C-alpha cells in the first residue's frame, strides 16, 4: 500500500474523531525518516490545540488503527499542532487566515515564477490574491496551487 493511500485512509478515520472533539484535522502524513516510519496527524482549533487535545485523539486513533490493522509496517504515531507554518489546505483556511503572511508554490510558473510570498488579501472563485511587496497584487488560480502555508511574521 502506498504512503499516500495509508495517509488517505487514516484521514478518513481521524477526521470524524477530531470533529467530535471540536478539532480540525489539518493534515495526515505517512513518511519514512532515518529508516523509521511515522504517521503524523496535525490538528488545530481556534485559539490553538493543547496537549490534552493531542493525547485524546492519539489514544482513540491508536485504538481504531489497531482494530483495523491495515498498515503493513510498524510506525510511530505522532499527533500535534501544525505549527506556525501551518499548511493551507481548504478554501476555508484562506478565509480564516486573511491578512496573514503566506508562502504559495505553483505547479507551473506564473509571470515567470513558481514561489510567491506575501500577505493574503482574499480568495474567491478565481483563486487566491496576495500582496507582494508594497503595491503588487497577484491572483493565483486554485488549480495552480501546489503548496501553501502560513509564513512566520517577525
From Swiss-Prot:
Keyword list, A-Z: Cytoplasm, Ribosome biogenesis
UniProt keyword annotation of Cytoplasm present: yes
One Pfam family cited in the UniProt record for this chain: DUF150_C
Keyword set includes Mitochondrion: no
Subcellular location: Cytoplasm
Gene3D superfamilies per UniProt: Ribosome maturation factor RimP, C-terminal domain (2.30.30.180), RimP-like superfamily, N-terminal (3.30.300.70)
Gene Ontology cellular component list: cytosol
SUPFAM superfamilies linked to this entry: YhbC-like, C-terminal domain (SSF74942), YhbC-like, N-terminal domain (SSF75420)
One BP annotation, GO: ribosomal small subunit assembly
InterPro entries the UniProt entry points to: Ribosome_maturation_RimP, RimP_C, RimP_C_sf, RimP_N, RimP_N_sf
CDD domains listed in its UniProt record: YlxS_C (cd01734)
General function of this protein: Required for maturation of 30S ribosomal subunits.
Similarity comment text for this entry: Belongs to the RimP family.
Protein name (database record): Ribosome maturation factor RimP
Organism encoding this protein: Desulforudis audaxviator (strain MP104C)
